[in-house]
């Protein structure tokens, strides 16, 4: 299920284009049968062939074999949990760390509401969403890289 954007009928230019049949359905060719019938039979086997080819040509192990009798000195989470791990590691109060972790998705859920009144799709005309996206794109790698460093260098990434 997708979100369909309705044309802006209050704009006289859009109304004139729609009256001539030149509105939102003006460009391109139909998806059926041109795209949906001919592209997947080529793309799906090609993707499978590339995956199998890489597996056959490079069958090296991903890491060293697991040893259930030896515990590593420092247990690190998977890479996609690194920013969250860094939040928990640097905040001294664990309850505050858990609340900060819960604030991330809660903040992302709030972002669309102030932007809902804005009819523009251009990111430069949607300052709240663009700022939140830019800040998240900058902070997430910073926290992720910092999680792999020792705790005394983790916030500054060893630069200062």
Swiss-Prot record:
One annotated GO molecular function: electron transporter, transferring electrons within the cyclic electron transport pathway of photosynthesis activity
Listed GO biological process terms: mitochondrial electron transport, ubiquinol to cytochrome c; photosynthetic electron transport chain
Keywords noted in UniProt: Chloroplast, Electron transport, Membrane, Photosynthesis, Plastid, Thylakoid, Transmembrane, Transmembrane helix, Transport
Listed GO CC annotations: chloroplast thylakoid membrane; mitochondrion
Gene3D superfamilies given in the database record: plastocyanin oxidoreductase, Single helix bin
Subunit details: The 4 large subunits of the cytochrome b6-f complex are cytochrome b6, subunit IV (17 kDa polypeptide, petD), cytochrome f and the Rieske protein, while the 4 small subunits are petG, petL, petM and petN. The complex functions as a dimer.
Name recorded for this polypeptide: Cytochrome b6-f complex subunit 4
């Amino acid at each position: 299920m997708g979100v369909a954007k309705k044309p802006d009928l209050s704009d006289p230019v859009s109304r004139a284009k729609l009256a001539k049949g030149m509105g939102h359905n003006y460009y391109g060719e139909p998806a059926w049968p041109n795209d949906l019938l001919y592209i997947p039979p080529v793309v799906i086997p090609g993707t499978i062939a590339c995956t199998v080819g890489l597996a056959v040509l490079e069958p090296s192990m991903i890491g060293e074999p697991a040893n259930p009798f030896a515990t590593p000195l420092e247990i690190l989470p998977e890479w996609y949990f690194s920013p969250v791990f860094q939040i928990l590691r640097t905040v001294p109060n664990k309850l505050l760390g858990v609340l900060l972790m819960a604030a991330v998705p809660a903040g992302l859920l709030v972002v669309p509401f102030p932007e809902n009144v804005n009819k523009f799709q251009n990111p430069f005309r949607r300052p709240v969403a663009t700022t939140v996206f830019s800040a998240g794109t900058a902070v997430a790698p910073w926290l992720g890289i910092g999680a792999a460093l020792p705790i005394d260098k983790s916030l500054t990434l060893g630069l200062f």
